[in-house]
Amino acid sequence: MSKLYLMSLGCNKNLVDSEIMLGRLSAYELCDEPSKADVLIVNTCGFIDSAKKESINAILDLHEQRKKDSLLVVTGCLMQRYREELMKELPEVDLFTGVGDYERIDEMILKKTNLFSNSTYLQSENSKRIITGSNSHAFIKIAEGCNQKCSFCAIPSFKGKLKSREISSIIAELKDLVARGYKDFSFIAQDTSSYLFDKGEKDGLIRLIDEVEKIKGIRAARILYLYPTSASEALIKRIIASEIFINYFDMPLQHISDNMLKIMKRGANSTRLKEMLNLMKSAPNSFLRTGFIVGHPGESEADFEELCEFVKDFGFDRISVFAYSKEEDTAAFDMEQVPFKVINKRLKIIEKIVDEVIEKSFEKEVGQKRLVVCTGKSSEGEFFIAAKDLRWDREIDGEILINESECGNLEMGQIYECEILQNLDKKLLAKALRKVDAN
């Protein structure tokens, strides 16, 4: 049997595409050593400069490691965005494809031909997919592309306009996954709260939530990547009212200064953002994640100081911060740029603030009882079982270390009520109190 090595870079949306490619290539034996693979695939990220460099380095590293007569395939956002340049500059690569042909990857490899469809790939309920990394959780991609016009973002230039999956397609995929034992789902897209806007339906997510709640066997769900102008008050209230969807609110704000929100073409002012955030924060056991960009063209010292004060005071649970990345095909590309030294200085300042805010979020968990899902072996060694707070993103929000149990041996994928005993440098030490369900 031929062996396959697949490297998925970037976001969880890329991961879903990688899992679909794995489904199409199920005849191959997966291996974790590039030097032994007959086919090597890199699913690239092309979002910002650091991600582009990571993708290029990964391609070159795999070329160095691969065996003679193997096939190196490059796909994904970077390839779609810089198709002509990369095909000229990467003779190390055997086959190229973009973001439209994930379900034809097997055909492409068989025929040893490049493929570039004119449209972005949109998953269907019939898409074969091999879930990776969990026996209980899966990401569900509900749409592709984006209709927003943020000044700094090039995603619409290579992902295209918003294209929503039909609700029936999503429900069919969920039912299949539940039948296979998956019970925990994270709904994702470039802009989840714009779901079905392209079909003329506002608040389409509310209807999706209604349908998801009818499926027996789903124990938890969360929605990632809400957008400030497309996430309505009605949607937030519907999430809060749900018995299945967790009060996990992931809304990248990018800034809080009205001046910068206007320059960045975010479509909402600070008053609107704060109203939305306060509604989210009022929900029982709410968990708020956001992201900010510093050093965008037009950002003054006053704008930056306003952002820092807001980050200090609001009380987010998790925050990602990024230095502005100058990207082609964006409105900000031709604006007067903030000097690199200033950007880097601001990034260091806000990173320190964010670190303190996140530390407080972890610290306030001590003494609480939380529902957690066991995820397997811990990064801290054999004496701990790793788990995630059921509210958290499955990849990035942290780790819980269970070293005591009042309910016997713990099972991977199972939910337990735990008491949080201690904060150990952004990892929570916990004791398992009881098994929550027998599923």
From Swiss-Prot:
<dbReference type="GO" id="GO:0005829">
    <property type="term" value="C:cytosol"/>
</dbReference>
<dbReference type="GO" id="GO:0035599">
    <property type="term" value="F:aspartic acid methylthiotransferase activity"/>
</dbReference>
<keyword id="KW-0479">Metal-binding</keyword>
<dbReference type="GO" id="GO:0006400">
    <property type="term" value="P:tRNA modification"/>
</dbReference>
<keyword id="KW-0408">Iron</keyword>
<dbReference type="GO" id="GO:0103039">
    <property type="term" value="F:protein methylthiotransferase activity"/>
</dbReference>
<keyword id="KW-0808">Transferase</keyword>
<keyword id="KW-0411">Iron-sulfur</keyword>
<comment type="function">
    <text>Catalyzes the methylthiolation of an aspartic acid residue of ribosomal protein uS12.</text>
</comment>
<comment type="similarity">
    <text>Belongs to the methylthiotransferase family. RimO subfamily.</text>
</comment>
<keyword id="KW-0004">4Fe-4S</keyword>
<dbReference type="InterPro" id="IPR038135">
    <property type="entry name" value="Methylthiotransferase_N_sf"/>
</dbReference>
<feature type="binding site">
    <location>
        <position position="11"/>
    </location>
    <ligand>
        <name>[4Fe-4S] cluster 1</name>
    </ligand>
</feature>
<dbReference type="InterPro" id="IPR006638">
    <property type="entry name" value="Elp3/MiaA/NifB-like_rSAM"/>
</dbReference>
<dbReference type="InterPro" id="IPR013848">
    <property type="entry name" value="Methylthiotransferase_N"/>
</dbReference>
<protein>
    <recommendedName>
        <fullName>Ribosomal protein uS12 methylthiotransferase RimO</fullName>
        <ecNumber>2.8.4.4</ecNumber>
    </recommendedName>
</protein>
<keyword id="KW-0963">Cytoplasm</keyword>
<feature type="binding site">
    <location>
        <position position="45"/>
    </location>
    <ligand>
        <name>[4Fe-4S] cluster 1</name>
    </ligand>
</feature>
<dbReference type="GO" id="GO:0046872">
    <property type="term" value="F:metal ion binding"/>
</dbReference>
<dbReference type="InterPro" id="IPR005840">
    <property type="entry name" value="Ribosomal_uS12_MeSTrfase_RimO"/>
</dbReference>
<dbReference type="Pfam" id="PF00919">
    <property type="entry name" value="UPF0004"/>
</dbReference>
<dbReference type="Pfam" id="PF04055">
    <property type="entry name" value="Radical_SAM"/>
</dbReference>
<dbReference type="InterPro" id="IPR023404">
    <property type="entry name" value="rSAM_horseshoe"/>
</dbReference>
<dbReference type="InterPro" id="IPR007197">
    <property type="entry name" value="rSAM"/>
</dbReference>
<feature type="binding site">
    <location>
        <position position="146"/>
    </location>
    <ligand>
        <name>[4Fe-4S] cluster 2</name>
    </ligand>
</feature>
<dbReference type="InterPro" id="IPR020612">
    <property type="entry name" value="Methylthiotransferase_CS"/>
</dbReference>
<dbReference type="GO" id="GO:0051539">
    <property type="term" value="F:4 iron, 4 sulfur cluster binding"/>
</dbReference>
<dbReference type="InterPro" id="IPR005839">
    <property type="entry name" value="Methylthiotransferase"/>
</dbReference>
<feature type="binding site">
    <location>
        <position position="150"/>
    </location>
    <ligand>
        <name>[4Fe-4S] cluster 2</name>
    </ligand>
</feature>
<feature type="domain" description="Radical SAM core">
    <location>
        <begin position="132"/>
        <end position="363"/>
    </location>
</feature>
<feature type="binding site">
    <location>
        <position position="153"/>
    </location>
    <ligand>
        <name>[4Fe-4S] cluster 2</name>
    </ligand>
</feature>
<feature type="domain" description="MTTase N-terminal">
    <location>
        <begin position="2"/>
        <end position="114"/>
    </location>
</feature>
<feature type="binding site">
    <location>
        <position position="77"/>
    </location>
    <ligand>
        <name>[4Fe-4S] cluster 1</name>
    </ligand>
</feature>
<keyword id="KW-0949">S-adenosyl-L-methionine</keyword>
